[in-house]
């Protein structure tokens, strides 16, 4: 019985000792488990058996236990309510510009945030702890300023990776967490694709006002740090200034960083600008295409459809803002010019196929398009030389049209007298009735030339018989009636048929001449519109594209980064 009581007393004593000592060391033991600092009492590493290792481990273990024995990471590190605000030195270093989503107006960046503040509870005397001057502890064990990105675009306001904090013996805490932010950025598409954007990163405390937590520049660097920046293949960084905004009346304190970037235009120049410019000038060449090819309207409509595709492409890239992008303006100009080209082509085709039977050419059209504009456009029209039975004649004369030498060079000598009789009869009839029988001023000249040509081509004709000579001699005077009676019915029919054929050919040549006039009007109009469209297209191309402020600027990204580092970084950091 006595032995049982002694055993119970011993167990109660052990239980009380364990309970009292265990509660005291719970917090330190839990912290050690997170900081990877081994408990010297439970160490299984044989290397820790050395004197130096034991001393270091014991000092660090003791330091951690002493620092966090009564430390509360939920309380702002101030001694009392009336103490000054906690000053947080804040800085941003941009590592990579990942993407600029123009459609959704989002800037995606990879940055390193730098925050430094003083926590008086984490100060110690290094001499008391084996000259240990700093510690690396988990960030969830110390108080952290709740600084977030205000203009966040994806709902993730905090950093994704909570790195360790660096604590020195003065109580200064430095935290450098990496973060990948998606921030809202107002995209100005007015000069696309030669655009320059200014995106902002706004940081501040989410719950503390300026009387509780106040932001200052880290190392007095009033800009985004670029010393570890990796160049982007799409955008060039132009400037990265920062601004500290402090509004005492609103107790507001925040930092605004402006990231000025400029687009690299080579990709869009090759993919978008050059094809659009070529299509615009190709629509001009539609007016150089002959109407007879039948492809003028098809070419202009095909180009119109291609421009519609490019317009849809630009609309899918850019956001639907109130500003019209530069490329949109040029595509709109090319679109309007192409529609005008379709209308002009239809009008030209309509004019080209007009004839004297359907349209009568007005006098002003003849003067403007056949006389004035050809000289102005340096267009020389070929001489109108109709072809009649293989011989070149400038114009037809009423008297010579029935001459057998002009109509049928191979006609036999027997029929020639009768044709000459008919010609002389018409001439005599015109003279007797008081009508003018004067020929065109060139008729005699052409008649003489044709007589020479005809004499070289045909053999000497047989002499006319006596009856024929008598008929020819008797055509003058009062023997007209008697001579007509001697002509046989067959000869009359032949002469009338030849006269009808000649008259029909004369009429066809006259109609052809009028059709050629309409065709020439269409050619002049084609040339006029071609020059106008070429001038408008060239002027519009140069005027719209060259109006961009940075179209001819060359950006040396390495030189700009070096210049910005020299401008914003302290001399000791830059060197």
Curated annotation (Swiss-Prot):
Regions of compositional bias (Low complexity) in chain numbering: 38-50
A Pfam family that the UniProt record links to this protein: Neur_chan_LBD
* Disulfide pairings: 185-199
Q: Enumerate the Extracellular topological stretches.
A: 21-270
Q: Topology with regard to the membrane?
A: Multi-pass membrane protein
Q: Does the keyword Nucleotide-binding apply?
A: no
Q: Which domain of life is it from?
A: Eukaryota
Q: What residues form the membrane-spanning segments?
A: 271-291, 299-319, 331-351, 528-548
Asked if the Swiss-Prot or TrEMBL record annotates the protein with the keyword Glycoprotein, the reply is yes
Entry's Gene Ontology BP terms: calcium ion import across plasma membrane; chemical synaptic transmission; inorganic cation transmembrane transport; monoatomic ion transmembrane transport; neuromuscular synaptic transmission; positive regulation of translation; regulation of gene expression; regulation of locomotion
Q: Which residues lie on this side of the membrane: Cytoplasmic?
A: 352-527
**Altering residue 309 to M: what's the impact?**
In n2420; constitutively active. Spontaneous convulsions and shrinking behavior in response to touch. Convulsions are suppressed in an unc-74, unc-50, unc-38 or unc-63 mutant background
Give me the glycosylation sites of this protein.
41-42, 80, 131
- Record key words, sorted: Cell membrane, Disulfide bond, Glycoprotein, Ion channel, Ion transport, Ligand-gated ion channel, Membrane, Postsynaptic cell membrane, Receptor, Signal, Synapse, Transmembrane, Transmembrane helix, Transport
Could you tell me in which tissues this protein is expressed? Specifically expressed in cholinergic ventral cord motoneurons of the VA, VB, DA and DB classes but not AS and VC classes. Expressed in PVQ and DVC neurons in the tail.
Start and end residues of each stretch annotated as Disordered:
31-57
Which compartments is it annotated to reside in? Postsynaptic cell membrane; Cell membrane
Query: What if the gene is knocked out?
Result: Locomotion is slower. Moderately resistant to paralysis induced by acetylcholine esterase inhibitor aldicarb but sensitivity to acetylcholine agonist levamisole is normal. Reduced both cholinergic and GABAergic motoneuron activities characterized by a reduction in miniature postsynaptic currents in muscles.
Q: What does this protein do?
A: Non-alpha subunit of nicotinic acetylcholine receptor (nAChR). Acts in cholinergic motoneurons to regulate presynaptic neurotransmitter release, thereby ensuring normal level of excitation of cholinergic motoneurons during locomotion.
Q: Which PANTHER family match?
A: NEUROTRANSMITTER GATED ION CHANNEL
| Record's protein name | Acetylcholine receptor subunit beta-type acr-2
Q: Which gene encodes it?
A: acr-2
